Amino acid sequence: MDKNISFTLKVWRQRGPKEKGHFQTIPVKDMPGDTSFLEMLDIVNEELINKGEEPIVFDHDCREGICGMCSLYINGHPHGPATGATTCQIYIRRFNDGDTITVEPWRSAGFPVIRDLMVDRGAYDKIMQAGGYVSVNTGGIPDANAIPIPKPVADEAMDAAACIGCGACAAACKNGSAMLFVSAKVSQLALLPQGKVEAARRAKAMLAKMDELGFGNCTNTRACEAECPKCISISNIARLNREFISAKLKD
């Protein structure tokens, strides 16, 4: 059984997107090591409510590393110190007794703060609406199994489809670029026969929307790849660049 640890929680508090924020320091005593990070925040919030104080606002849903909503910057890393894991998959045992744990929201022009640790990630939805889908008729459900796709290609498309749209890539990037997200969504479709028909339009539309929403440009620092909880490869960015250049040459 994991031992209990005590630490200092330094949490960003901000009442709204236009308000000035500040850090609140909260001492946490004897937290069991097998408590998940979000469970710890639940416990802290319960104590704050009992004292008549405002609870910490943070986003969450599945708590299984699938939805991407638990987007927190922990000790300078998106989703915390673990590799290939989301915030909800982080446990208190990863920290040491006496540590100061700093928790912040995503810092990106494309993700305005709603309150405290919750940001508006609707920009990613708008990018998806610009072209992250297949709209042409690809036949019925059984027809997909009738189209031969090489196993390596199918695996590569599946790897790209692992992206959960959490926003860690844009938050980690010094330019606030969403290229890893866009490239993963373009790749998962561009690699498959069903997605090739609209490949040119998709690449141009999704990149245009990304630029419109205030995300920066990629300068290949690879911070996105290092911090991605699903280990999405930046080789997808190279593919997106090829798709975009090919599409522009056809204009």
Residues of each region from the PLM?
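Short polar catalytic/cofactor-binding loops
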Residues: 11-17
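Ferredoxin-type iron-sulfur electron-transfer modules in oxidoreductases and energy-metabolism complexes
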Residues: 35-54, 101-251
